[in-house]
Amino acid sequence: MANIIRCKLPDGVHRFKPFTVEDYRDFLLVRNDIEHRSPQEQKEIITDLIDDYFGDYPKTWQPFIFLQVFVGSIGKTKSTVTFICPKCKKEKTVPFEIYQKELKDLVFDVANVKIKLKFPSEFYENKAKMITENIHSVQVDEIWYDWKEISESSQIELVDAIEIETLEKILDAMNPINLTLHMSCCNKYIKKYTDIVDVFKLLVNPDEIFTFYQINHTLVKSNYSLNSISKMIPAERGFVLKLIEKDKQ
């Protein structure tokens, strides 16, 4: 199994070790712990969990990195989500694309001028400030100018020229998590996910805890040590389990 996961971040490609089976067990325990906690407590716990793994990176990059490493570790770019159709009340299962290509700086056209924005390195309560503080440069007549070299009046004029539709696209692109779930039954539904807490709760099911230990038990009975199992990545453990089950047929 490959033991490196590549993530494309604003400053280039970074390499990370995949999560192990031991890590995944911890995620299950955390998921179970937050089940009946308040939204604020859930946010704090998941934020701290991710920071423990990727604390050397900006806070805004960490959710993206966590999800990329998680996806690489389980060996799947899609998960499955179950929902209840609001109309017929039937239970439906749909695929959920959880892979994001990269985290990068942004370029948008505003009033015939290209504006380049750095991907934020911190979270902002004030969204307008998040945009103005991260504008890096502007392109006029094929020439790029540093934002700081432009007069304050010109800066204000350019920012004011940003249309609502473009503004919404910029804010959307500044989310480290940006996933879309498509659901279909009697009608079609679309749900956007921009919060790592919501995504974590979808991907890590507390009901998996019993199955998790059951799989470990099966592998131990096939002469794998708990230590070696814990050091596997989840995708690898899944392959081993399939081989064991195939041998029993």
Curated annotation (Swiss-Prot):
Chaperone is among the record's keywords: yes
Name of the protein in its database record: Baseplate hub assembly protein gp51
Pfam families: T4_baseplate
Superkingdom classification of source: Viruses
Gene name of the record: 51
Alphabetized InterPro entries for the sequence: Baseplate_phage_T4-like
Factors inducing expression: Expressed in the late phase of the viral replicative cycle.
A Gene Ontology biological process term: viral tail assembly
Known function: Chaperone that is involved in the formation of the central hub of the baseplate.
Keywords of this entry: Chaperone, Late protein, Viral release from host cell, Viral tail assembly
